[in-house]
Every structure is written in structure tokens, then in C-alpha cells.
């Protein structure tokens, strides 16, 4: 039974939205139990003297009334409430905070921009895979936070007073999506970035991660339009041109952009364009968590794992009672196959990691039923929270597991956007073969298989006499050759001369 003492909550009183995260600690990470979000647009209630309007404050208080009911079941020392840019700026913030604290029955901490950047970085470090050296970008409603670091340690924390709500009111107040408005918004953001750009570039990074609603919106757009998951400057410029053609904010229609995000999307896009150009960012991916996750992990005092994906996969193996030895056996075999063909098939370390991940949980569907276990596996992966994996990577893993045995379904392989289609198909072929060869679940029955490729033709070269000595697996390989030929993947079986 889940007791209230095991629950934690983090509330973020942002400039655009108020958010609440309710979670519990499980296996070194947090399990989300509830997320509640309300668009309050607090920053829109600031006048020229930086006073919050009564209407804006009322919207905020009404939202906190909703939050307070859920908080009644959680110990007070396991709740953190923080306020960010707008309440840092508002001259009458005390009036809002006094009433807000009465509603929640909890203290509210107005955190500095640098502390906000630190917490965002911690949320990313605990939930997002990839290289250790990272740049984290979060475009909020009233401010933009930038943080660099290695592993759990931050090296630079910056907060700039520009956000998607304030930029909307300043540069798109006439609701026109004309090129001039975009130009002014971008230019203002670039001028704000220039004093800090050089020092950020000097820190360097191996991966750039976006942790904001703007980046989430971009990810949704790219998935809807069948693009890969990496945000790049050409893609941002293409979206800007599309927005300009829509002419009016009320008429903004982009496939994959929800109505809820549309209002502040152009202003957030202008800021992101400026960040990409000033910091010379090549690609950006979506973070797995940010400020609220950073608050919860901070209360739990959990260390940052060196390999978040490994922790996630190990948790799945324990939860679903998987045969870890068999998973390793299949993984080792698949890795051996990949290394033999990596150069000819252009399979890099990213492909290697994703294939390894699929192997380590390939039997997860058996926890539901042997029948249709690949479909069960795909469902479980698709609908599980997998810290360290991006949404596109999750989709690819589910697709590989769906196609691990039986006839191949090319459709999901072509619809995933984590890898080019031909790379995803090649990983699928290697996974299927590794599962066949490891089917006896013993190390001493694995043959020394050599792989040769010519274009898409894959040749398996086996020791002399192996096929006749292992009739069941020989039959499985012959069936596999037929299944692969149906989707134009030539698979040839050969033996070395005696």
C-alpha cells in the first residue's frame, strides 16, 4: 500500500503556467504519480511599473486552491514551492505571496535566476541520457535560463530576463506574425545573449538539451511531420517562415502544434533562434525533466547516475523479472554482429547503444503472456516512463521489440524518427538474428558466426556442418531468411568449407 509519507511534491509558480508534480522514489529515480498544470499567464498581468494586476493574482490564487487539495495528503517537509521570474520582478509580489501561502499552508521561496538554472540543470542531469558535458536551455514565460555542466556539477549558471510571455507582449502585441516582428524579437534576444555568449561557448558541451514548453512544442511538431527528433537551425528557420505565412497569431496553424501552445510559440521560437545563432548550437534534444524534477531529486538527495539509461533498463529487468543472463547473452551476440558490419552499414555508437538497450529488455512481453509477446513488449515500452531515453528513442525501442520475431512489419520502422529508416531496419535484422542464435539460452552453444554485407545483402557464414548438427536453429534461420526476403532484405546462409 502506498502511504502518504512516501509522496513528494514540487510546485513551480512560473510566469506562464503554474505546475505541480507529485512523485515517489523508486529504484533510484522518481515515479510520477500526478502532473497538474494551469495556464495562469502571470507575466501578462505586469504593468509598466511591474505591478501585478488583481486579475492575474486572482488567476494564480484560484489555481493554488486546486493544488492545495492534493497537498493535504503529503507531509509538509516533502513539499517544495518555488516562484520564478514574474514574482522576482513584481513590486507587489508580497501581496500575492502572502495570500498564496495562506491557501497552500506552506512557505513559498522566490528563487534567484541562478538557483532556477541550477535546479533545472539537476532535473536534466537526473532524467536525460547522453554525454556528460551538456548545455541546458529553458525558455520560461518571463526568463530564460542557461546552464553548462559535467555530470551533476554545474560550471556556469545564467538567467536572462526574456521569456515567451514577455516577448509576446513586447514584440507580437499587435498579433501580427510579420517578418519585422520576428526580426525585432530575435535581435533583442541576441543583444541580451551577447554579453554571456562567449563565456558559455568557452565552457563547451557535447550535447545541448532544451527543457521548456517551446522545445516540447517543437518536438511534437517534428514527430507529427515525420522529421527526426533533433532541433536544428534550418528547421527553426523553416518554422519561422511558415509562421510568417500564417500572417496573424490567431491564424497560426502548424501540423503538430497544439492550440494551447500556439499563443506563445512565435515568441519562444524567436528567442530560440537567437540562442542557436549566438551560441552556435548545431543540434538540440528534449530534456526528460527540469525544474520540478530538480526540486524532487533535491529533497530525496539521490546521486546522479553516470548512466541513466542503464539504471532505467536495470529497473525494468527487476520490475518484470526478466532473465538477465539471457538478455546479456543476446546483447553480447548482437553487439558482435553489429561490430562486424558497422563500417559497411554505417552503424555508429548511437546505433550500438540503442540495439543494446533493445536486447536487454527484449523479453519484457513475456511478463504478460507468451502469445503475442512482441506486441506486449512494444506496448510496455511505448507506455513506460524511461528516464534517459527521448520520446523518439522510446518509439524506436518499441518498434524493434515489436519486430523481434515473426514476419517483419516495415510500417513502424519507417514511422520512427530516432534513426534513418535504413539504420533502424539494419538494427532490427541484427536483433532478430541474435535472438535466434541465443535461443538455447546457453553460452556453450553459440557458434562463431561471421557476417558479410554487400549493400542490403547479409551473408551469415557458419562453421562447417553447423546447420546439420543444429536442425531446429537451421530451420529457424531458413524461415528467417524467407521472412527477410519478403521485405527485400536478402539473407544468405553459408558454411565454411570442411
Curated annotation (Swiss-Prot):
Protein name, per record: Guanosine-5'-triphosphate,3'-diphosphate pyrophosphatase
EC number: 3.6.1.40
Domain of life: Bacteria
Family from the record: Belongs to the GppA/Ppx family. GppA subfamily.
A Pfam short name: Ppx-GppA
Signal peptide region: none
Catalytic activity: guanosine 3'-diphosphate 5'-triphosphate + H2O = guanosine 3',5'-bis(diphosphate) + phosphate + H(+)
Alphabetical UniProt keywords: Hydrolase
Protein's UniProt keywords contain Hydrolase: yes
Stored PANTHER family: EXOPOLYPHOSPHATASE (PTHR30005), RETROGRADE REGULATION PROTEIN 2 (PTHR30005:SF0)
Primary enzyme class: hydrolase
Organism of derivation: Pectobacterium carotovorum subsp. carotovorum (strain PC1)
Its job: Catalyzes the conversion of pppGpp to ppGpp. Guanosine pentaphosphate (pppGpp) is a cytoplasmic signaling molecule which together with ppGpp controls the 'stringent response', an adaptive process that allows bacteria to respond to amino acid starvation, resulting in the coordinated regulation of numerous cellular activities.
Keyword Signal annotated: no
Pathway field: Purine metabolism; ppGpp biosynthesis; ppGpp from GTP: step 2/2
GO molecular function: exopolyphosphatase activity; guanosine-5'-triphosphate,3'-diphosphate diphosphatase activity
GO biological process: guanosine pentaphosphate catabolic process; guanosine tetraphosphate biosynthetic process; nucleobase-containing small molecule interconversion
Amino acid at each position: 500500500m502506498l502511504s502518504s509519507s512516501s509522496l513528494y511534491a514540487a510546485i513551480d509558480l512560473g510566469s506562464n503556467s503554474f505546475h505541480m508534480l507529485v512523485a515517489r522514489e523508486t529504484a533510484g529515480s522518481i515515479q510520477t504519480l500526478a502532473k497538474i498544470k494551469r495556464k495562469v499567464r502571470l507575466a501578462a498581468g505586469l504593468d509598466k511599473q511591474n505591478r501585478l494586476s488583481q486579475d492575474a493574482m486572482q488567476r494564480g490564487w484560484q489555481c493554488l486552491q486546486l493544488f492545495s487539495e492534493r497537498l493535504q495528503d503529503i507531509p509538509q517537509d516533502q513539499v517544495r514551492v518555488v516562484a520564478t521570474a514574474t514574482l522576482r520582478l513584481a513590486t507587489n509580489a508580497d501581496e500575492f505571496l502572502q495570500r498564496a501561502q495562506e491557501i497552500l499552508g506552506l512557505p513559498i521561496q522566490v528563487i534567484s535566476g541562478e538557483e532556477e538554472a541550477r535546479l533545472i540543470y539537476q532535473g536534466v542531469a537526473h532524467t536525460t541520457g547522453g554525454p556528460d558535458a551538456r548545455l541546458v536551455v529553458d525558455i520560461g514565460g518571463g526568463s530564460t535560463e542557461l546552464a553548462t555542466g559535467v555530470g551533476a556539477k554545474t560550471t556556469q549558471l545564467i538567467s536572462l530576463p526574456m521569456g515567451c510571455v514577455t516577448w509576446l507582449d513586447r514584440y507580437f502585441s499587435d498579433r501580427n506574425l510579420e517578418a519585422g516582428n520576428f526580426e525585432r524579437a530575435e535581435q533583442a534576444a541576441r543583444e541580451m545573449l551577447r554579453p554571456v555568449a562567449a563565456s558559455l561557448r568557452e565552457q563547451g558541451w557535447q550535447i545541448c538539451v532544451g527543457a521548456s514548453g517551446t522545445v516540447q512544442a517543437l518536438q511534437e511538431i517534428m514527430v507529427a511531420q515525420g522529421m527526426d527528433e533533433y532541433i536544428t537551425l534550418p528547421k527553426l528557420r523553416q518554422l519561422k517562415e511558415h509562421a510568417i505565412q500564417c500572417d496573424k497569431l490567431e491564424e497560426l496553424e502548424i501540423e503538430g502544434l497544439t492550440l494551447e501552445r500556439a499563443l506563445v510559440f512565435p515568441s519562444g521560437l524567436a528567442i530560440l533562434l537567437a540562442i542557436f545563432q549566438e551560441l552556435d548550437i548545431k543540434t538540440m534534444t528534449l530534456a526528460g525533466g527540469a525544474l520540478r524534477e530538480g526540486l524532487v531529486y533535491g529533497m530525496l538527495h539521490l546521486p546522479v547516475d553516470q548512466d541513466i539509461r542503464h539504471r532505467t533498463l536495470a529497473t525494468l529487468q527487476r520490475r518484470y523479472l526478466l532473465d538477465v543472463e539471457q538478455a546479456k547473452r543476446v546483447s553480447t551476440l548482437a553487439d558482435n554482429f553489429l561490430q562486424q558490419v558497422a563500417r559497411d552499414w554505417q552503424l555508429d555508437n548511437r546505433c550500438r547503444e540503442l540495439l543494446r538497450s533493445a536486447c536487454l529488455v527484449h523479453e519484457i512481453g513475456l511478463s504478460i503472456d507468451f502469445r503475442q509477446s512482441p506486441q506486449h513488449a512494444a506496448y510496455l515500452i511505448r507506455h513506460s516512463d524511461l528516464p534517459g531515453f527521448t520520446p523518439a528513442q522510446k518509439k524506436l525501442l518499441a518498434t524493434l521489440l515489436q519486430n523481434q520475431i515473426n514476419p517483419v512489419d516495415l510500417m513502424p520502422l519507417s514511422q520512427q524518427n530516432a534513426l534513418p529508416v535504413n539504420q533502424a531496419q539494419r538494427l532490427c535484422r541484427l536483433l532478430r538474428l541474435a535472438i535466434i542464435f541465443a535461443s538455447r539460452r546457453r553460452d556453450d552453444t553459440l557458434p562463431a558466426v561471421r557476417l558479410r554485407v554487400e549493400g542490403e545483402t547479409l551473408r551469415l557464414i557458419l562453421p562447417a556442418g553447423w546447420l546439420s548438427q543444429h536442425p531446429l536453429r537451421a530451420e529457424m534461420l531458413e524461415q528467417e531468411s524467407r521472412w527477410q526476403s519478403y521485405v527485400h532484405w536478402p539473407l544468405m546462409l553459408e558454411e565454411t568449407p570442411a
